[in-house]
Amino acid sequence: MVQTHHIVSGHSGNESDITLRPDTFSAAYASTPIEPDDHQFLVPEMKHLITWADVDAEEASNIAKGRAWLIAQHFTLDDLFDTLTLRTIHQRMFGKVWTWAGSVRRRETSIGIDPSQIQTQFEQLVQNFRWRAANADEIGFSEEERRELGIRFHTELVAIHAFVNGNGRHARLVANLVDSAMGLGSLADPLYPWGARSGLPSAESRKL
């Protein structure tokens, strides 16, 4: 079992002041200056960033490094169906850019559940899927059900919207890790490709 000792840290500041941005991309949006309410949550090393294009570039670099770390971990399903692991993955993906990386959302948004319910539903989600994985043989999982497990986990994880941002990208990566843990593809050659591997433009892939 992988050791998730790279524990996430809480963020500073008032999260209620964050202006959530969508996981989508456009040229007009990219050139928009980062608003002060968002800028305050950049890590000290990123305070020099000015536009969302700058942020997108740094996030892409951070995610690439996070993927490299994830590939080396060899996660099991028990590892992945664990809230600490999921928070650690999010922190690895965004922690070099944002102070809120890996921290559970504490404000209400138009997307996702009420923040007061996140911890409970987050834990219920991983317990449910951990049970499914442990009892797959007894339940009689078909090959199709095995191939859909990662996608189903992705769907329910996105619905909770546990983090301030990056939920879609995080859930897609976790879905690939779930498939990989079952011997169905890998991060390098995923069972269900997202983004460029799926044939979609980058702008559309970030909406998935």
Language model features by range: what are they?
Residues 1-208:
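FIC/Doc superfamily catalytic core
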